[in-house]
Amino acid sequence: KSDLKTSKVPAGRFVLGVLLSILSGGLLLLAFPPYGLWFLAWFAFVPAIFAQYRLLPRKQASLAPALYLLVWLGPYLARLFGNVAGPFFTYLGVLIAIIAYFMYTERVFHERTGYRWLIVQGVVGWVGFEMVRATFIPVIATSAFIGYSQASQAWLIQPVSLFSVYGLNMVILMVNYTLGQGVLAWYDKRRGNPAAEAVDPGSTRKWLLATSLVLFAWVATSLGILGSAPRDAPTVRVAAIRLNYPLPPHQDEVNTSQVRFERFAALARQAVGQGAQVLFTSEMTFNFDPREEYTEELRLLATETDTYMFLSYSVLAEGQPRRNQTVLLSPDGSFSEAYNKTHL
């Protein structure tokens, strides 16, 4: 059998490592819309973790994350951004996979430290980078947050109101990496790997127990919050308004502000005719601040339809940072403070 610390492994193991890495990417892709197999996110990383640390040679270990990111983010981001934003965003998933191949070099560290930091590094590294890109990297921002795959599961996501989506992301990654370490420990015991190269089974059992408790506490809290919701709460009909123009407003020279307002007004009246009381617009629906332009027209529309309107817009002004914001317009004509998606 091959030595885990050498750069050579049998061809069969290498191929299996590649296939398992691709499997992880496929599971992650299926966990997100439009497929919506949300439960796959809770163990999707496990095949790639096993491939990275037990099947692929050390020098090519980063091929595992590169492959699952390619299979997952390649089609996911291409579908999200389409061709409108240019080839950079269309093929962004490919670029991320290439960068990952050169960045995921932690295998040597985990071998030298007996894998005692595997779970901590996996969870903190992943969620920490999510925080960084959400705060400092526009456009990409929160795209493909692992917790978003759970959006349809009301029974599971209620603690997000307490711990934010990052809390949910941490629990999902903790489950994945704990299961991954469990598979590594099982494999080491089965193969009889030397203690210096093997995962500590005692540490793994402790992590399995701790992760089980965290998951139990999360689910129990979620069910408790959901169960405490009012049984006779009023039902409010909400409409999502999309203008369906091919370009964002700051790039669109055909559909002017007036055209966009008129289209929105027509769709708003149509939605109200179907019983909507709250209207949401998609990101960057308008290219003007509703508190500064078309203000009276929008106020009259809100009063006429007796609806609450969440108005999203993007403003580009020379010498100023781009504003990507949303304001709430109430039926009485009052505007809320702007919510800044770009954290300005």
Residue spans for each PLM region:
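Soluble catalytic regions of membrane-associated enzymes that act on cell-envelope
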Residues: G224-L344
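Membrane-embedded alpha-helical bundles of multi-pass enzymes
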Residues: D3-I225, V278
